């Protein structure tokens, strides 16, 4: 067998007719090169080419396999490009537009969590009022508390303007620059209204000075100008009656540069007053400026009436009376006489508590002080009023809202020894007339209570309206009967009291709980007398509870909620109760 170390196939011309193999190992070094091969002219004759040269004529590539690879690679590339474009578009949509806030807040407010959220307020120029006038209405933050650290901002009760939830305790900390002060305005208010704002309330406290203002009801307070850079706002609700809450704004201002709304009166100490507090007979400003020039403001309204009889009426009588009026008629007749007063064509704005437009009638007592006979409003005229002395004062007041036709009134002086009462009326011992239907109704209609002195044969003893105390928290007091409805706090049944007191179970852990319980039960479940009337707790009960509980409530962030001076003293055992 012949072993070749190298084989070279040389093809030069198509004219070569034969193929020669050359092995350099057997050739001389100076020998001639490999002669060119000679191929026959027959075209049918072919020589296969080496694999490292041109392809043989009889072999073709697999084109279908190549195009399949190209198609797969192209599809993969397009898929990657589409994914990249989608990612870029998503990032562009998520990015805030130029000039927008870096911490945008949703229109519905932040979701309330167990931790106190931090709320970044708007940094745009202009006051909140200016923003509203320009048509920009920022969405109020309805979260339950938080930190308000911007130079201005809005906040509101949870769910506003829908009713706020029960058992709520929200705390907002308003913080502005230390060289600025805070101005705050409550634009809308609807919170359960009870004396001293005992149940639902909004408290404003500039820190570290302490409590300043407690708010409830439906009338927003005037603009508040403070001298503090940190304001604490607390909103508390119990488990029963609800309202739609409040909506407020604040802004930073230079100290001493506060302002008031266009319909408010400004005192020189940056105190703002509502129109109802101007020319009301009480100096609210330190310089008394709110009670000056009142006669010019209410010209043709009120006056002194000294004749034995006379007539007076509201401005623009039988037409719409003006807004923001304060008229006072002083009726004075000779001593030894009394005054009978009657109203005609009575038409004032109606409201359950006569808070807006109303008439008040006062009479003088033996000491010369004025005492209130009654406040009246609506379309039903007041009853005939008879004074026990020779002086009466009639006060007519209107607000800036609804107006009506007003009234006219006549008065007549008569000798105090005469009886001016009609056939269906009985006279009070201290003077005045009351209808027979009001006698022995367990309510003191006469100022001296003589209408309920029912021991005589004319009036049989009334049926007792007392009922057993059923409120668990108030069992074991010095009395065991009460009477409802309770007009002091506006509760109809004891079941309502149970619902209210359920929000105060947390106070049972306080060392002063028993003192606070006596006061709270004395107010909500008052003592019932044998005649069916009720007695409030004595002032000493309230003062003792305040002394024992004030510091403990302060630790809970709640100031003392009662004004003890509104309760009677214990000098008269029939005037108050010791629960």
Curated annotation (Swiss-Prot):
Membrane-crossing segments per the record: 70-90
FZ domain sequence ranges: 461-579
Domain of life of the source: Eukaryota
Cell compartment(s), UniProt: Apical cell membrane
Gene3D superfamilies per the UniProt record, alphabetical: Frizzled cysteine-rich domain, Low-density Lipoprotein Receptor, Spermadhesin, CUB domain
Keywords from the named record: Cell membrane, Disease variant, Disulfide bond, Glycoprotein, Membrane, Microphthalmia, Repeat, Retinitis pigmentosa, Signal-anchor, Transmembrane, Transmembrane helix
Disease: Nanophthalmos 2: Rare autosomal recessive disorder of eye development characterized by extreme hyperopia and small functional eyes. Microphthalmia, isolated, 5: A disorder characterized by posterior microphthalmia, retinitis pigmentosa, foveoschisis and optic disk drusen. Microphthalmia is a disorder of eye formation, ranging from small size of a single eye to complete bilateral absence of ocular tissues. Ocular abnormalities like opacities of the cornea and lens, scaring of the retina and choroid, and other abnormalities may also be present.
This protein's name: Membrane frizzled-related protein
Provenance organism: Homo sapiens (Human)
């Amino acid at each position: 067998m012949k072993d070749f170390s190298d084989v070279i196939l040389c093809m030069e011309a198509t004219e070569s007719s034969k193929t020669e193999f050359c092995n350099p190992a057997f050739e001389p070094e100076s020998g001639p090169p490999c002669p060119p091969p000679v191929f026959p002219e027959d075209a049918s004759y072919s020589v296969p080419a080496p694999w490292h040269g041109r392809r043989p004529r009889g072999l073709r590539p697999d084109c279908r396999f190549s195009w399949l690879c190209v198609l797969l690679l192209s599809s993969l590339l397009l898929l990657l490009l589409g994914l990249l474009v989608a990612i870029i578009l998503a990032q562009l949509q998520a990015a805030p537009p130029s000039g927008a806030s870096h911490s945008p807040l949703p229109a519905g407010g932040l979701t309330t969590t167990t931790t106190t959220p931090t709320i970044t307020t708007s940094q745009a120029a202009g006051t909140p009022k200016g923003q509203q006038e320009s048509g920009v209405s920022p969405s109020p933050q309805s979260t339950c508390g938080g930190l308000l650290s911007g130079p201005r901002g809005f906040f509101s009760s949870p769910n506003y303007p829908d009713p706020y939830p029960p058992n709520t305790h929200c705390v907002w900390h308003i913080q502005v620059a230390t060289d600025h002060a805070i101005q705050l305005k409550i634009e809308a208010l609807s919170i359960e209204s009870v004396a001293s704002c005992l149940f639902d309330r909004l408290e404003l406290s500039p820190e570290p000075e302490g409590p300043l203002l407690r708010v409830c009801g439906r009338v927003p307070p005037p603009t508040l100008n403070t001298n503090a850079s940190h304001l604490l706002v607390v909103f508390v609700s119990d488990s029963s009656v609800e309202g739609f809450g409040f909506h407020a704004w604040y802004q930073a201002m230079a100290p001493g540069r506060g302002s008031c709304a266009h319909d408010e009166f400004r005192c020189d100490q940056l105190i703002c007053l509502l129109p109802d507090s101007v020319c009301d007979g009480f100096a609210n400003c330190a310089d008394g400026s709110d009670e000056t020039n009142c006669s010019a403001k209410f010209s043709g309204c009120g006056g002194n009436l000294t004749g034995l009889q006379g007539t007076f009426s509201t401005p623009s009588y039988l037409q719409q009376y003006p807004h923001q009026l304060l008229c006072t008629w002083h009726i004075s007749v000779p001593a030894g006489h009394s005054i009978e007063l009657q109203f005609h064509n009575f038409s004032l704005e109606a409201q359950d508590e006569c808070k807006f437009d109303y008439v008040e009638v006062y009479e003088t007592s033996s000491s010369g002080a004025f005492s209130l006979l009654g406040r009246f409003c609506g379309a039903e005229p007041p009853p005939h009023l008879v004074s026990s002395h020779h002086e009466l004062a009639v006060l007519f007041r209107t607000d800036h809202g609804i107006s009506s036709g007003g009234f006219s009134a006549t008065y007549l002086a008569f000798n105090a020894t005469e009886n001016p009462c009609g056939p269906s009326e009985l006279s009070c011992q201290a003077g005045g007339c009351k209808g027979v239907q009001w006698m022995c109704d367990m309510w003191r209609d006469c100022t001296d209570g003589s209408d309920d002195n029912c021991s005589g044969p004319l009036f049989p003893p009334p049926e007792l309206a007392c009922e057993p105390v059923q409120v668990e928290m108030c069992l074991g007091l010095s009395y065991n009967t009460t009477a409802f409805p309770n007009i002091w706090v506006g509760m109809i049944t004891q079941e309502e009291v149970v619902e209210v007191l359920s929000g105060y179970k947390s106070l049972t852990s306080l060392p002063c709980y028993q003192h606070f319980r006596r006061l709270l039960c004395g107010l909500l479940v008052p003592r019932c007398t044998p005649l069916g009337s009720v007695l409030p707790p004595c002032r000493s009960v309230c003062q003792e509870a305040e002394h024992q509980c004030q510091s403990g409530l302060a630790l809970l962030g709640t100031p003392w909620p009662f004004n003890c001076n509104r309760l009677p003293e214990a000098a008269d055992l029939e005037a108050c109760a010791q629960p």
